[in-house]
Regions:
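C-terminal helix-rich "cap/oligomerization" subdomain common to oxidoreductases
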Residues: 217-255
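Predominantly a Rossmann-like dinucleotide-binding segment in NAD(P)-dependent oxidoreductases
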Residues: 46, 54-134, 250
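A short glycine-threonine-serine/GTX helix/turn-capping micro-motif
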Residues: 98-104, 199-207
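Hydrophobic residues in well-ordered beta-strands that form the structural core
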Residues: 22, 48-50, 177
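Short polybasic amphipathic segments
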Residues: 166, 185-195
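Contiguous beta-strand/loop segments that form the cofactor/metal-binding neighborhood of enzyme cores
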Residues: 111-184, 203, 213-224
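A general structural signal for well-ordered alpha-helical segments in protein cores
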Residues: 6, 10, 33, 60, ...
Length: 255
């Protein structure tokens, strides 16, 4: 579904008594995410989760483990890039009125990943956006996120050579992910560089969509909390909104 239909159809599904695994983003903006969050209170027995499938790939568990074990010291900054080229005027990603544009489509991954790894929320956001003159969608977006103890920067684009990577820089070393967000058909390599030495870990091919579906099914069967809460989804949308606002006003936004 296009992004503008995520909220109404999720609510329709809840009204029909269905659990919902909704593709990201959970809505068009933070206001819609908040509306859904409030709506779910009427259905305490139903599970709703935003589908950020990347978090279920085993490479992320390994990276989180490296960080929690202190292998790179304290995180100082995270850098991420996610780009592809799509100039098809009929593609939903290039239609402004229904939630097209790079930030909602792929920039949300960069923001989500930074928050996930830092286990914190940014307090200040600065954004720069380039609009497509024909589609009026954001074809290029960059952001600087200031967290309490670190920073994160990202760039996403719908009209650039396809690329994705993520680096985590710490006080004692850094981690690099070569295909952080959708290594669906291939194995992938994550590396840790410290004191002039490099450790590479080859992560075997895994379908993170399947793993996500399995995890969601498990929480339904066992009546457990969903792995990615709606509070998390709302927080991510607030940062996305702040990137848009900052670019429009050409000034940082405090959260």
């Amino acid at each position: 579904l296009p992004n503008h239909l995520h909220l109404p159809w999720t609510i329709k599904a809840l009204e029909a008594g269905k659990h919902v695994l909704c593709e990201k983003p959970i809505g068009m903006n933070a206001a819609e995410a908040k509306q859904l969050f409030e709506a779910t209170k009427k259905y305490p027995d139903l599970k709703v989760m935003e589908a950020f499938m990347y978090r279920f790939h085993p490479q992320w568990k390994e990276v989180k483990s490296w960080i929690s074990e202190g292998k790179i010291g304290d995180i100082k900054t995270i850098q991420s890039v996610f780009t592809y080229f799509n100039a098809d005027p009929d593609n939903i990603r290039n239609k402004a009125g229904i939630g097209g544009g790079g930030l909602l489509d792929i920039g949300c991954y960069c923001i989500s990943a930074s928050r996930y790894l830092l286990e914190a929320e940014p307090t200040k956001v600065y954004g720069e956006i380039e609009l497509d003159p024909d589609f009026n969608t954001d074809r290029m977006a960059s952001g600087i996120l200031t967290f309490p103890k670190a920073t994160a920067t990202f760039t996403c684009s719908t009209q650039a050579s396809p690329e994705q990577h993520l680096k985590v820089f710490g006080t004692e070393g850094f981690i690099e992910m070569e295909i952080p967000f959708n290594p669906l058909e291939n194995s992938c390599t994550i590396s840790l560089k410290k004191n002039g030495e490099e450790i590479e870990s080859k992560v075997m091919q895994a379908n993170h969509y399947t793993l996500q579906g399995d995890a969601f099914s498990k929480v339904i069967l066992n009546n457990e909390p969903v792995p990615t809460s709606l509070e998390d989804a709302l927080s991510n949308m607030r940062v996305i909104d702040a990137v848009f606002e900052s670019s429009k006003n050409q000034s940082p936004v405090r959260l």
